[in-house]
């Protein structure tokens, strides 16, 4: 049996992984242990379970995947109001009714955190994604609406840091200043912007990279993990790819992979 006592016949069973963020919801279809399809939806806090069921069935039709083959689904949400509606909607789609919401109680990870109930399920999923890759010392930088840093040492989740995301920073500037325009965020040619737009690009992107590099260096020093791998994930990780040497690997689907690993390695009795 694999870790967690899951019978072999369920190890690579088709499943859905749902990462519900503040801005977007990403649905991943796993089969044979690999991500087959991925869809990015707008997060709608008022969505009902009926609407969610209908949308998921539509996605399965588009992906030409019969829902009758699904064996499980896992949810990680930072929008608590959506957990119940997604859970109920997916229960009607997955024939086995095996739908699990990831949290600090059932993640199966050692947590060195003052108040584990406050840990976002997406951050736990990232830690599980590391476990699936056999990485025990790491800093995961998840670049989304917020930019989060998740620290794992010896397989134990320690916490991390939370900062405004790149786009969130821009919207805050635009909303609180009279003269700064909203711009399409682009990679700047140089740090010194010769126009307001270029200066914004520099501050938003290169400034963000500077924050990343400083925090990673400090985390490695404070936690005594100088060789910790740095893994970047999240929607904005694609934009920053190649702009910093601090990142060892870009894994845009790490959160989904962690949810897949969660289903495949944690017994239902722990849910």
What is each PLM-predicted segment?
Residues 64-68, 133-135, 223-225:
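Glycine-rich phosphate-binding loop signature in dinucleotide/nucleotide-binding domains
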Residues 64-119, 154-159, 165-166, 194-205, ...:
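Short beta-strand-loop/turn "lid" adjacent to the catalytic site in phosphate-handling enzymes
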């Amino acid at each position: 049996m694999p870790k967690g006592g899951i019978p072999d016949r369920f190890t690579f069973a088709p499943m859905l992984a749902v990462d519900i963020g503040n801005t977007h919801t990403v649905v991943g279809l796993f089969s044979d242990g690999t991500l087959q399809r991925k869809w990015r939806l707008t997060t709608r806090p008022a969505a009902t379970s009926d609407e969610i069921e209908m949308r998921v069935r539509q996605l399965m039709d588009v992906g030409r995947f019969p829902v009758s083959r699904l064996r499980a689904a896992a949810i990680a949400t930072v929008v608590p109001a959506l957990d119940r509606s997604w859970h109920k909607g997916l229960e009607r789609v997955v024939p086995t009714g095996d739908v699990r919401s990831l949290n600090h109680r059932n993640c199966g990870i050692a947590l060195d955190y003052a108040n584990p109930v406050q840990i976002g399920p997406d951050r736990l999923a990232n830690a599980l994604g590391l476990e699936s890759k056999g990485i025990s010392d790491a800093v995961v930088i998840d670049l989304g609406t917020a930019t989060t840093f998740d620290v794992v040492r010896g397989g134990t989740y320690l916490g991390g840091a939370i900062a405004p995301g790149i786009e969130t920073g821009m919207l805050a500037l635009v909303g609180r200043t009279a003269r700064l325009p909203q711009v399409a965020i682009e990679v700047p040619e140089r740090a010194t912007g010769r126009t307001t737009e270029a200066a914004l690009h520099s501050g938003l992107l290169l400034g963000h990279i500077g924050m990343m590099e400083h925090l990673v260096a400090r985390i490695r020093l404070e936690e005594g993990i100088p060789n910790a791998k740095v893994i970047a994930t999240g929607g904005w990780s694609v934009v920053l790819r190649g702009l910093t040497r601090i990142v060892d690997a870009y894994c845009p689907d790490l959160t989904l992979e962690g949810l897949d690993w969660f289903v495949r390695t944690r017994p239902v009795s722990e849910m």
